[in-house]
C-alpha cells in the first residue's frame, strides 16, 4: 500500500489549527491509518477478500484499488477479467473513497450504493486498477455540509478501470449515500 500524505498534507497544507477546527479527529487519525482501516474492511468481506483487492492510496484525489487478474478471470478461454469483478472493483473504489473521506472528517458512517450505471468498453487482460472520485468538483464539501446538518447525504461518484495504456476499459457512474452508524 502506498501512502503519500499525512492528513494535514491531504487537507491542502492548511495550518494545523485550521485542520483541527474543521475536522474533529484524534491525533492518530492520519491518511495512512485511514487507508489501513479501509484495507481491513475489505479483508473482512469474504467476497472482496477472494478478489485480492489492495488499497493503493489516494492519487490526485482519487482512491486507487488494485486486484490481480488471476483472481478475477471469467469463463472464457482467453482468460480476461470477469465483468462482475470490474463492476465490484469500481463500486468498492467509490464506496471506499466516501468511507475514507468520512473517516478522515471524523465521522463514523455507513455508506451504501444507491444506484449505478456501468459501461464496459474493452476487455481487460492485465491486473485490474480502479480509480474513483466524486463526479463533480466541489461536491464533497456540499456532501459533508449536508451530512453534518441532516445526518445523511448523497454524492455522485465516478470510477474507471484503466488499461495499461491509460484508456478506459470500464466506467461506473453512481450515487452513494451515507448515514451515521448506529
Describe each model-derived feature in a short phrase:
Residues 50-81:
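Catalytic strand-loop segment that frames the active site of acyl-thioester-processing enzymes
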Residues 49-53, 114-120, 142-144:
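Short structured motifs
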Residues 17-28, 124-125, 135-182:
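HotDog/MaoC-like acyl-thioester-processing domains
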Residues 1-6:
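Extreme N-terminal basic, low-complexity initiation segments
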Residues 72-98:
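A short mixed-secondary-structure module that forms the rim of ligand-binding clefts
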Residues 33-41, 48, 140-142:
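Short Pro/Gly-enriched beta-strand edge/turn motifs at strand-loop
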Residues 97-137:
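Hydrophobic beta-strand-centered segment that forms part of the acyl-chain substrate-binding groove
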